[in-house]
Structure formats: C-alpha cells, structure tokens
Amino acid sequence: MSKLTTGSFSIEDLESVQITINNIVGAAKEAAEEKAKELVNAGPTLFAGLESYRDDWNFKLLDRYEPVITPMCDQCCYCTYGPCDLSGNKRGACGIDMLGHNGREFFLRVITGTACHAAHGRHLLDHLIETFGEDLPLNLGQSNVLTPNITISTGLSPKTLGEVKPAMEYVEEQLTQLLATVHAGQESAEIDYDSKALFSGSLDHVGMEISDIVQVTAYDFPRADPEAPLIEIGMGTIDKSKPFLCVIGHNVAGVTYMMDYMEDHDLTDKMEIAGLCCTAIDLTRYKEADRRPPYAKVIGSMSKELKVIRSGMPDVIVVDEQCVRGDIVPEAQKLMIPVIASNPKIMYGLPNRTDADVDETIEELRSGKIPGCVMLDYDKLGEICIRLTMEMAPIRDASGITAIPTDEEFTNWVMKCADCGACMIACPEELDIPEAMGFAKEGDYSYLDILHDQCIGCRRCEQVCKKEIPILNIIEKAAQKQISEEKGLMRAGRGQVSDAEIRAEGLNLVMGTTPGIIAIIGCPNYPEGTKDVYYIAEEFLKRNFIVVTTGCGAMDIGMFKDEDGKTLYERFPGGFECGGLANIGSCVSNAHITGAAEKVAAIFAQRTLEGNLAEIGDYVLNRVGACGLAWGAFSQKASSIGTGCNILGIPAVLGPHSSKYRRALIAKNYEEDKWKVYDARNGQEMAIPPAPEFLLTTAETWQEAIPMMAKACIRPSDNNMGRSIKLTHWMELHKKYLGSKPEDWWKFVRNEADLPLATREALLKELEKEHGWEIDWKRKKVISGPKIKFDVSAQPTNLKRLCKEA
C-alpha cells in the first residue's frame, strides 16, 4: 500500500466510492474536553494535569502531613554516573539528594501501580467494546452517580462503554507525563515527587473505576447488591475427584470464555474451576447479577499460589496478569501441569499458539511436548483450557504426581534439618522454622501445622537450605488436616455503593453517629498470618462500623468461622450500613470505596464533583470518618491505591513490612498551628483537633492497628453524639488492646457532651485535676479549658477560596 503524503485530493470524478473513517486519534478526548468546558458548575481542575492540585491542595496536605522517609539504602544506582553515596546529606553526581531520590523511589512505585490498573482498564475496555459495542449502556445498579472518580478528575460522566474512552486516554496521557519525571535530570524535590505521587494516586482510582464499571456492565456482575451470593473459598473446597482448572491473576476477560464453554457443554458439575487472587473474585461475580447458584470457587490470595501447585491438585493452570508468581512454569512442569498464558503482560517465554489449530495445541500440551503456551485468542482459549483439563485429569491421576512427601519421605527430610537457622533468616516473616522442625523430630507436628497460615509461600527458605529440604512441602504435609478443613464463605463482590445507601448513611457519617468506614484491602504479606484481618474486621463490625473489603483482604476474612461455624459474611449484612460487611469486589473495585466517600459529598452535601477534587478531598478530610487498612500490602498497586485514598483525605494504616515503601505521611499533633482551618461561613480561622493525625503510616501489630484506626475516624465536624461515640470506641479499644487509656484523649473534647456517657463523670474529674479545666459540678458542665470550641453550624475547610468572603 502506498504511503499517503501531505496534501489534498479530490473524489469529485470518482464513482461508487465509500469512505469509512474509524477512529481519529485523540479526537474523542478533544471532543470530551470541549464538552467538559461547557459545564456550568464545574470545579477548577477539569482534566487535571501534574500541576493542577499542587498548590491548591497537595501542598496543604503535605504541610500538615509531613513526609517521613524510610530509605532502603544510601545509594542511588539510576544512571551511569553512579552508584552515588547519598548518606550524610551528600548529593549524587546529578545533584539529587537523599530526600529527592527517596521521593522518586516512592513515586516510581505509585506510578507503576497506577499503570498496572490503567493497562488493565485499557485491555478490558477495548475487548468489551469490540465484543459488545460502544453503545452498551453502563449498568451499575440503582444509581445516578456512576463514575465519581472519572467525574472528579475530568468532569466527564460517561453513560456508555464508548463514552469511557476519553477518560482512559486522559489517564494514559498523564501517566506518560508522570513517568517522564523519573528520568535522570528531571524532578529533584522530594515534596514535588510527593505531590506527583498524590496525583498519580488519583489517576489510579480512575483506572480502577474504568476497569470495574466496564466489567460489571458487560459481564453481569452483581450491581450494588448487598445480597450477592456466598462463594465457597479455601483449598479444602476443591473436589479432588474432579478435573481442576486453576486460574491465577487479576483480569477475568479470558476466564469468562472458559466458563461459557463449561456452561455450553454442561460441564459445570463435572469439573472444578477456581482461582487465586482477584481473577478468583471476578470469576465468581460472572453472571451473578441475578444471583444464580454459583459453581466457581475461590482458593485464596497470592500466598496460596505455590502451595496449590505443590499440592498437585490443578490439572491445568491459566495465568493472566498481576500478582502472578514468576516461577509457575518450572514449578508446574515438575508436576505435569500445563500452563497457559492468556495475556501479553505475562508470557513466560512460552511458545505462542494464538494462531495455531486447537486440536494440535491440545495435543502438544497433553503430551508434554511443550510445558505451556501463549493463547491470546479467547474463543480458542475457552475451548483449549476446558478440553485440556478434562484430558489431563486422568493422565495425572494415573501418575499420582504431587510434591507433598509421603510419611516416610517427610520423616527423612525432617531428620535432615541441621538447625542452622538459615531458613529463619531468609524468611520475610521471620518464622521460626528451626523450632518447628525440632518439635517435628520428636513427633510433634503442631508447630509446622501452625506455620501453614503464617507462611506466604515464597520458598526463600528452600533456596538457602544447605540440606536442600523442600521446607514448604514439609509444612504443607504437616498441615494436611488443616488444609482439608479450609472451607469458608465469601460474599461475591457486590460492586458500587448505591446512591440510596449513601443517602441513608450520609448524615450519620458526617455527624459521626456512624463511627466510621473501615476499608480492609490489599495483599497477603501479613506479619502473623491471615487471621489478623479477621480479628480486625470482627472487632469493628461488632462496634457498628461500616466495614468494606476488596481483594485479598476480602478473601482472607472469609476463611475463618466462629464457634457456631459461621463466617463474618454469614453473621453480618452485606450492605453499606452500620455493622455491615460489604465485599465491594476485586482490586479494581477499590475505586468504589473512594467513590463512596466522594458520593457522600456529592449526594448528601450537594457538592460539585466535576473537576473538583480539592473541594471533595477537603470535605472528606474534615467530615467523613473513614480509614483504610492494607495490612499485608506488598505490591506497587497497593501503594498507588493507598496514595489515591490519601489525596482524598482518607488515612490508611499499613502492616509493618510497608516501611519498605519508603515513605509515610504523619502529622505532629503537638504543632497547634498545623491544626487550624477556615470557617467557610466567614473565613475566620478555627482550631480543630489533631484528626486524622496521619494519612499513611504503619503499625507493628494488629492490636496496635485497631485503636489507631478507630482514632483515625474522628473528624473536626463530628457533632456531640458522634464525637462521644467515636471517643468511646477509641478509648475502649486502646484500653483493650494496649492496656491503657490514650494520653491525648482530652485534645478531642470540646465540651462535656463530647465525653463517653458511661465514664463522663470520671473523665470530668480527670480534666479538672490533670489538665486544669474548670468544671461546674452542679450542672456537670465544662466552664473553661478546651482549646477547641464546639459550633454545630461551623463549616471547616482548608481552602480559603471556599469561604463566603472569598
């Protein structure tokens, strides 16, 4: 085909000519930008760029919540000038210092996570438009506010798949700009890297929102459904007598074709399909909008991947993208398990059979001629995976292949342990494997059994063992009874929080009478096993907090039962309500959690969403009690999700490993000048309590995290009843888990009505004796003492431009 050159041509004299114009690059976004400019009440940051939030909002956050850096090392190895020693306030050859370099390191993690979700969204959007067409209406349930994150960043409110495209192009364009700042000789100021990280976090929630709204719409996922079906979860739920197809990753597009093939060929009760990570959550949402009886199952999080493979249960493994182990092919190959890569982001060096014949490909995989293949044609993928699973099952059953040792092999391996401690040093969780091996030598396997839940399945211990003991296999052998009983229930991801739920809870959240929203999200890098998140969720649910979950956290909460044999999903309702446990969905569903906070501002307070992030973030920071928990955070995506919460004024608590992200955002509660805002009624300064006192921090134990999170739900706008309720929970939890009353509780008291009702008199005495407050004991009222005054009609804001005098 000849190359078109610049110029013009005429078709005046041609006959029967048809000209088809498909996509004009950038045209959709340009048209959307022009349309957004026509909005009457839009905020100041339509299609926000790198600098848009910097001065008006980000720097205000960073002034109060100062970055606390935790470098992993003192060197910079970015370019060929290096490596440069940045210790002792030295600068590198390019001029950057440790602060700037560390800011860049954290920022790089955030944009990596943002890119991951954005690419996920792009893949789904393109595939679903190709399959269902651009005109498919977005259907997320009974809501009018469908896309709060898209709207807050761009001003757009898409109603169809096609109308989502400009928002996708916007995220991709800004990601390119952000990535460019990482290059040597670009940004060097730590505070500006933090500002850019916050901006990237906001983009991450747009990318996640795109991913979930298009799949909820096209795949008939539950739509804001508080009674979505309960799904079986755990390794013990797999029927070993049936062929088993195991899917791993986060992008469910290809898996839907496998499920369609199973249903078309009446195989849903003749084989097992189950998953790990968020693909597992989303495959159990597929076609569940009408609450049909589910047949797909969830095994668990990334920490279970190697454990499941070593068990020998899967007959075929299919991977897509994100949080997939890098050693799946060699591990599966040892056990005759074919591996099929269904997404170009993970191809493992496998031969590409996308254009090959289905029968020939199945024969290559069945015979072991190739260990696996790349298959990007989803129609073929669905057929190959199901047929291959049915064919591999009898072959593998006949061979009896498993990595789990026999009783004799188990004893021999245990006796080989030299108690050198190398495994414990290598273990990310510092598990006392030598101690467990010592007890096993004496016939007590309970210590190894306990390690099963605490072990994250990384096999670092095996690689340093001088005796070449397959330590993971030993642990799994000892835990066989526990594994067989690992049967829980998880509510299928329900999707967005509906407008009706926001109207019902908005007032309670802003006034403080609903104590807060606790969002349990993130990965499985827990310091002491998965049950930590169960304990945390149960504590807050019993205290009438709204608990929302996604991803690995949602799975792990469903793994455990009470003395009556019920999981938390069975014990508590699935709505966005006081004492409700709402599984929102997979990782990309996290956008609906920030979306819920944004919808409180939009629906309850009638604040403009369009291009108005700073005002919405200001509203949430001052009025909506919410705190995130990523107790096992390990990935770059976790850092971008958390940072996206931070820019909206939502604090997050991370587990002890998360200091490796290199940065926290912590305020100094004793710097009184940092705890002043404007009263929007008149522009006058007003003092507020130090709440929340961090945006991003870590805790050492789950017992420390619980009171920390309860405190982080206190907000300046709480009314007396709300403040009293929140102080009650915080002080009780502090006493329960840390053994004492918090030292700074009095800083949050504005008058006697703020005090917990049951202990009001005792606390008034303490205020008088310890802090010099004047108390009218006849009326039991505070006469003087508080530095913070209570005014029920005050309108706290950090933004001077929102004041009436402005």
Curated annotation (Swiss-Prot):
Its cofactor is [4Fe-4S] cluster; [Ni-4Fe-4S] cluster. CDD domains: ACS_1. Its EC number is 1.2.7.4. InterPro entries: 4Fe4S_Fe-S-bd, 4Fe4S_Fe_S_CS, CdhA, HCP/CODH, Prismane-like_a/b-sand, Prismane-like_sf. CO binds at H117. The keyword Chloroplast does not apply. Pfam families: Fer4_7, Prismane. Cluster B is an all-cysteinyl-liganded 4Fe-4S cluster; cluster C is a mixed Ni-Fe-S cluster which is the active site of CO oxidation. Cluster D is also an all-cysteinyl-liganded 4Fe-4S cluster that bridges the two subunits of the CODH dimer. Contains two additional 4Fe-4S clusters, dubbed E and F, that probably transport electrons from ferredoxin to the B cluster. HAMAP family: CdhA. This is Acetyl-CoA decarbonylase/synthase complex subunit alpha 1. It comes from Methanosarcina barkeri (strain Fusaro / DSM 804).
